[in-house]
């Protein structure tokens, strides 16, 4: 797999893949309900991150909010102007062991 032009997977693609997986297991669930579950899942992730909770999915990874220190000498890449960046919070993802091992095996 080349990392220069990687295929992009959208939420609709994921919904289609989950729908196919469900049908392959002889179950029926309309795509609109799959989309509702995915939307609710992401809303819960956002809500918990905004509450400064750590979200852990064993073997997949952990989501958390971290504080990033500000800098005095950051540069605006469009104008080249030096700007001051204040301390701020960022969402951070730390991959779990299984995900690390699976991604490590990707051929580039």
Curated annotation (Swiss-Prot):
GO molecular function ontology, one term from the record: DNA binding
Any single GO BP term: chromosome condensation
Record-level GO cellular component terms: cytosol
SUPFAM superfamilies from the UniProt entry: IHF-like DNA-binding proteins (SSF47729)
InterPro entries: Hist_DNA-bd (IPR000119), Histone-like_DNA-bd_CS (IPR020816), IHF-like_DNA-bd_dom_sf (IPR010992)
Keyword tags: DNA condensation, DNA-binding
Annotated TM spans: none
Family (UniProt): Belongs to the bacterial histone-like protein family.
UniProt function note: Histone-like DNA-binding protein which is capable of wrapping DNA to stabilize it, and thus to prevent its denaturation under extreme environmental conditions.
UniProt-recorded name of the protein: DNA-binding protein HBbu
Source organism per UniProt: Borrelia andersonii (Borreliella andersonii)
Origin organism lineage: Bacteria, Pseudomonadati, Spirochaetota, Spirochaetia, Spirochaetales
């Amino acid at each position: 797999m080349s990392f220069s032009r990687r295929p992009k997977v959208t939420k609709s693609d994921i919904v289609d893949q989950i729908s196919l997986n469900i049908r392959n297991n002889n179950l029926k669930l309309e795509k609109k309900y799959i989309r509702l579950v995915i939307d609710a899942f992401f809303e819960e992730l956002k809500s918990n991150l905004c509450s400064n909770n750590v979200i852990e999915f064993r073997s997949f990874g952990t989501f958390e909010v971290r504080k990033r220190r500000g800098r005095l000498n950051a540069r605006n890449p469009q104008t080249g102007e030096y700007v001051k960046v204040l301390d701020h919070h960022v969402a951070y993802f730390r991959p779990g062991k299984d995900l690390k091992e699976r991604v490590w095996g990707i051929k580039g």
